[in-house]
């Protein structure tokens, strides 16, 4: 981290040319979002990007990357020094795409011109899987409303099924839930000081996958929830839909 490296620009860079204009060879953090990049506090990626920038990090944004071509949007800025971050945008991508009657919406309020079709269904999972395939050794942090509300086993209305935690499907290293300004800065600061992504598990307001459950079960503060497998066995998904 270098406090003199802030972009001090009107916008955070979204292309390699804009990074070079700022004198950057590499970004510290690269944010992928399902929304257009609008530098306004109603857009979460812009808020997180500016908060990280204010903490002294070089932050670049890739808005609405194309997941259907040769994936050049996922490669154009190269590897970040610290980590990738992924958000579906201001809305869960399935709510963004479909009505309650599961009809495809004709517009997207978070895309230029209101045009639909510029983000995939289950955007966090799709973006994250692509990033992990291309850059398997770079830490990946997910956040935003889609990640936050899907952090546990959950009923997915659109597929009428139970789904496991989005941490499983996305293969992300860390999930930041809720208002993520404080934890994302701490993650960046500690990684910048040389910590491993696996040494950050004491940070409040995060989720991660761990097969060693014994150390948690001994704590009086631990609340045990049903596993995905147990929930699926009890056919909770079908019960949820029948109520409506």
Predicted regions and their residues:
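Acidic/glycine-enriched edge-of-secondary-structure segments
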Residues: 1-6, 55-58, 109-120
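Glycine-rich beta-alpha loop elements in corrinoid/cobalamin-binding modules
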Residues: 44, 63-241
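Loop/helix-junction capping segments adjacent to catalytic residues or to phosphate/diphosphate-binding pockets
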Residues: 38-39, 185
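Nucleic acid-processing catalytic cores of prokaryotic defense/repair systems
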Residues: 27-33, 40-78
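Short N-terminal or domain-adjacent regulatory/targeting segments
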Residues: 1-23
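N-proximal short alpha-helices
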Residues: 2, 21, 25, 104, ...
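A short, flexible N-terminal coil/short beta segment enriched in small residues
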Residues: 16-37, 120, 124-134
